[in-house]
């Protein structure tokens, strides 16, 4: 693991994926106590836990942790059907961003055709919608966010 300062400019997508992977592997998200390596008089390294009595001199310093690409290939246990960390850029933007494209807003221009069977690797929504009939629901939330009553029976015609 290497640390660099934040003054290197903007981060690439690969370095951000590496950073997320490293956080998961290092257990930083579990609030583990960081360790420091100290040298003894005979030159041997020992690992010392950092205590609150030792204030960090670099209070404003936030390191960026980068991981070798080989480490990404070795660790497959963090794979998820919803999130894919990859070194390669996706073939097209995620579906949520298609409405922001100027091509979609201008309906007079021709749409680009794509070949069948293209890969959608890495393009999963965070929360997949579920379409199914619900029969035991008495109240619901409409598209404006208001609580509404669900009718159990709809009468048609004159009453």
UniProtKB/Swiss-Prot annotation:
Signal sequence region: 1-3
Source superkingdom: Eukaryota
Prosequence residues removed at maturation: 4-113
Sugar-modified residues: 106
GO terms, biological process: cell surface receptor protein tyrosine kinase signaling pathway; modulation of chemical synaptic transmission; negative regulation of neuron apoptotic process; nerve development; nerve growth factor signaling pathway; neuron projection morphogenesis
GO CC terms, sorted: axon; dendrite; extracellular space; synaptic vesicle
UniProt cross-references to InterPro entries, sorted A to Z: Cystine-knot_cytokine, Nerve_growth_factor-like, Nerve_growth_factor-rel, Neurotrophin-3, NTF3_N
GO MF, any single term: nerve growth factor receptor binding
Pfam families assigned to the protein according to its UniProt record, in alphabetical order: NGF, NTF3_N
Primary location class: secreted
The keyword Metal-binding appears for this protein: no
Keyword hit for Glycoprotein: yes
Compartments, as annotated in UniProt: Secreted
Protein name, per record: Neurotrophin-3
Organism: Loxocemus bicolor (Mexican burrowing python)
Higher taxonomy: Eukaryota, Metazoa, Chordata, Craniata, Vertebrata
Family: Belongs to the NGF-beta family.
């Amino acid at each position: 693991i290497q640390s660099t300062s934040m003054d290197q400019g903007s981060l690439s997508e690969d370095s951000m994926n590496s950073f997320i992977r490293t956080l998961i592997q290092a257990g930083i998200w579990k609030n583990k106590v960081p360790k420091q390596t100290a040298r003894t008089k005979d030159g041997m390294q020992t690992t010392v836990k950092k205590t609150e009595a030792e204030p960090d001199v670099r209070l404003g310093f936030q390191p960026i942790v980068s991981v070798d690409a080989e480490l990404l290939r070795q660790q497959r246990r963090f794979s998820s059907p919803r999130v894919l960390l990859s070194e390669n850029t996706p073939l097209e933007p995620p579906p949520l961003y298609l409405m922001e494209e100027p091509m979609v807003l201008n309906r007079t221009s021709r749409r680009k055709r794509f070949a069948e069977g293209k890969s959608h690797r890495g393009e999963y929504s965070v929360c997949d919608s579920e379409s199914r009939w619900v029969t035991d629901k008495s109240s619901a939330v409409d598209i404006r966010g208001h609580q509404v009553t669900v009718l159990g029976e709809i009468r048609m015609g004159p009453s």
